[in-house]
Design a protein with these regions (language model features):
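Paired acidic/hydrophobic, glycine-rich loop segments that form the ligand-binding mouth/hinge
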Residues: 50-55, 70
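Long, aromatic- and glycine/proline-rich binding clefts that accommodate carbohydrate-like moieties
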Residues: 74, 123-175, 179
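Short helix-initiation/N-cap motifs at beta->coil->alpha
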Residues: 34-46
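Periplasmic solute-binding protein
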Residues: 1-8, 88-97, 169-178
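Glycine-centered hinge/linker elements that transmit conformational signals in sensory
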Residues: 7-37
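Soluble non-cytosolic domains of exported or imported proteins
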Residues: 12-19, 38, 100, 104, ...
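Short, well-structured alpha-helical segments that form the helix of a local strand-helix-strand
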Residues: 44, 187-198
Length: 203
C-alpha cells in the first residue's frame, strides 16, 4: 500500500508505490468478483467464506458462530524492515460546526452519546464503542471477546488523511482507478491525470 497524500497533504498517487499497490489490487481483482456488504455478511454468517475484510460493525461473532475476528498482520516477513500498520480506520467524527445555532444543546448531546453508559449500551445493539474503557472492560470482553481484537486494530491502525476535500478526493481517484480496472486508460495515463486533478483540488 501507500499514502495518497504526503505530510503536507500533497497528492502522491502518480508514484511507484501507488502503482505497485494498484497492480496488487488488479491481481487480486482478477481472482474473482467482490461481494457487496450484505452478501459478505451473509457468507461470513453462514460459514461459506474462508476470509473477509470487513468493518467491525458489520458482523458480531457469537460463541457458537462459524467466524471470528483477527487483526490484519502488520508484517508478513521476518526481515529487519520496519513494521508498518496496515489496518485502516474509518473516520467517524462528531463535532459542532461554527455556525451551529444551538451549540450548548449540541454539546449536551455529544456528552450524552459519548458517555460510558451510552457507549456500553450500544454494544448490545451490535455497536462498536469508541471509548477505550469500553473496549477493555473485562465484563464486556467476557460476552464480546471480539472487541479485544477491535481494540488491537485501533491501536495499530492508521487513519484516513484528515482533509476537508476527502469526498472529492476519493471521487477523482476512484474514477481513475475504475478507468484502469475497465481498461479504458493505462495505469500511467489514469494516475497522471488523477495526480493533476488532485493537485488542483488541493491547491
Amino acid at each position: 500500500g501507500g499514502w495518497v497524500v504526503d505530510e503536507n497533504n500533497t497528492p502522491t498517487v502518480d508514484t511507484p508505490e501507488f502503482k505497485a499497490a494498484m497492480q496488487e489490487y488488479l491481481d487480486l481483482y482478477a481472482l474473482g468478483s467482490t461481494l457487496d456488504k450484505d452478501d459478505i455478511v451473509a457468507s461470513v454468517t453462514s460459514g461459506e467464506t474462508a476470509l473477509a475484510q470487513i468493518w467491525p460493525g458489520w458482523y458480531t461473532p457469537t460463541a457458537d458462530g462459524p467466524a471470528n475476528y483477527t487483526t490484519i498482520p502488520t508484517k508478513l516477513t521476518d526481515d529487519s524492515a520496519p513494521v508498518d500498520a496496515v489496518a485502516l480506520q474509518g473516520v467517524w467524527c462528531i463535532g459542532i460546526p461554527d455556525n451551529a445555532p444551538h451549540k450548548d444543546l449540541a454539546l449536551e448531546l455529544l456528552e450524552y452519546v459519548m458517555s460510558p453508559e451510552v457507549q456500553l449500551a450500544s454494544i448490545e445493539n451490535n455497536g462498536v464503542p469508541c471509548r477505550y474503557s469500553c473496549l477493555t472492560d473485562s465484563t464486556v470482553l467476557e460476552t464480546y471477546p471480539h472487541l479485544q481484537t477491535v481494540c488491537g486494530a485501533l491501536e495499530t491502525g492508521v487513519y484516513r488523511p484528515v482533509i476537508e476535500e476527502w469526498t472529492e478526493f476519493t471521487n477523482i481517484l476512484g474514477t481513475e482507478m475504475d478507468n484502469i480496472i475497465q481498461g479504458t486508460k493505462t495505469m500511467d495515463e489514469a494516475l497522471a491525470y488523477a495526480q493533476e486533478q488532485l493537485e488542483q483540488l488541493m491547491a
